[in-house]
């Protein structure tokens, strides 16, 4: 585990409100619950004839993605548009960054265009924290995923999915399965589940895909699928991240599927009403059988729907927190 997983007070303003969203580590249960409650209230916007509310009218949100993304980028764009914000999405492959401009130079140029918020995805762990510490303080920073470190909005949309299907975290058993070592989603989910009071958090993976020190998250570690899935309420499958792997961690994808793929037979060991989740993109026949991904227990497409509402909640709350912080600073400067 990384020293980046320490409490980061710069996420909160002087009143304890969200002003950046960088990691779930150190955020109180009350704040995570507020995000879930706010997201719940935004779900009905997607069913309207006009799918908009005016909360961020006049604000400019820049999506700056240094890594490829489909679901995260698109749902952030939709979330901002449904809040009536103006949205700029930077294609890094055609931007000055691909010509040698530094990360901070790119963002400071966007900042000079009076952007109010950056949603940043970057391959380096800690990039979002670095940006929040170095750009103009009145610009809110939302972490869209940084290296292996964190993917906090994915963590929260997974929590909303679980809460809407299971009602409460208090008596749940949740299994997170697959490439734990390289997964920022796994880290965010473990933190969120622990904070929200889930008593039984399990990780299931080959020993080569388990990070050193994972026990600090308060999880039970399994290297056998049948044992780890026994009587669980929720199964969260993870993508096998070949692009982040060095050689020798796995014999083959086929061998991984044979031992750790979620099949109908293996899912039968979980509770009969267990739900199956996956952050996407899915590798069918590697992490999960198509019959399971498309089956009645799968809530994978629900996750995408809930992701828009969660990102609406985070964008609106962080913008509100930034405004409150500026007012606080102005009042105390007088």
Swiss-Prot record:
Biological process per Gene Ontology, one example term: 'de novo' UMP biosynthetic process
Family: Belongs to the aspartate/ornithine carbamoyltransferase superfamily. ATCase family.
Catalytic activity: carbamoyl phosphate + L-aspartate = N-carbamoyl-L-aspartate + phosphate + H(+)
Organism this protein belongs to: Pseudomonas fluorescens (strain SBW25)
PANTHER family in the record: ASPARTATE CARBAMOYLTRANSFERASE (PTHR45753:SF6), ORNITHINE CARBAMOYLTRANSFERASE, MITOCHONDRIAL (PTHR45753)
Gene Ontology CC entries for this record: cytosol
Protein name: Aspartate carbamoyltransferase catalytic subunit
Keywords: Pyrimidine biosynthesis, Transferase
Enzyme class: transferase
Binding site for L-aspartate: 99, 184, 239
Pfam families, per database record: OTCace, OTCace_N
UniProt binding sites for carbamoyl phosphate: 71-72, 121, 151, 154, 280-281
MF annotations from Gene Ontology: amino acid binding; aspartate carbamoyltransferase activity
């Amino acid at each position: 585990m990384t020293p980046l997983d320490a409490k980061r007070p710069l996420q909160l303003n002087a009143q304890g409100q969200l002003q950046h969203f960088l990691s779930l580590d150190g955020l109180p249960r009350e704040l995570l619950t507020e995000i879930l409650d706010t997201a719940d209230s935004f779900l009905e916007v997607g069913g309207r004839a006009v799918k908009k509310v005016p909360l961020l009218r006049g604000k400019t949100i820049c999506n700056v993605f240094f890594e490829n993304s489909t679901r995260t980028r698109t749902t952030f764009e939709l979330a901002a548009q449904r809040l009536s914000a103006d949205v700029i999405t930077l294609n890094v492959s055609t931007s000055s960054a691909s010509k040698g401009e530094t990360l901070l130079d790119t963002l400071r140029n966007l900042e000079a265009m009076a952007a109010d918020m950056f949603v940043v995805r970057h391959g380096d762990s800690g990039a979002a924290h670095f940006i929040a510490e170095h750009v103009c303080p009145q610009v809110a920073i939302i972490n869209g995923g940084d290296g292996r470190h964190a993917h906090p909005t994915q963590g929260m949309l997974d929590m909303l999915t679980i809460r809407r299907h299971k009602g409460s975290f208090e008596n749940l058993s949740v299994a997170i399965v697959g490439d734990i070592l390289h997964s920022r989603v796994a880290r965010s989910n473990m933190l969120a589940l622990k904070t929200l009071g889930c008593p039984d958090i399990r990780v299931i993976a080959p020993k080569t895909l388990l990070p050193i020190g994972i026990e600090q998250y308060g999880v039970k570690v399994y290297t056998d699928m049948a044992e780890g899935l026994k009587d669980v309420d929720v199964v969260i499958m993870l993508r096998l991240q070949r692009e982040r792997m060095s050689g020798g961690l796995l014999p083959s994808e086929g061998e991984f599927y044979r031992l750790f793929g979620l099949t109908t037979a293996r899912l039968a060991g979980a509770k009969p009403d267990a739900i199956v989740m996956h952050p996407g993109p899915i590798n069918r026949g590697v992490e999960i059988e198509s019959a399971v991904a498309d089956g009645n227990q799968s809530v994978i497409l629900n996750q995408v729907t809930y992701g828009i509402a969660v990102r609406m909640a985070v964008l609106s709350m962080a913008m509100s927190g930034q405004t409150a912080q500026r007012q606080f600073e102005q009042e105390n400067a007088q």
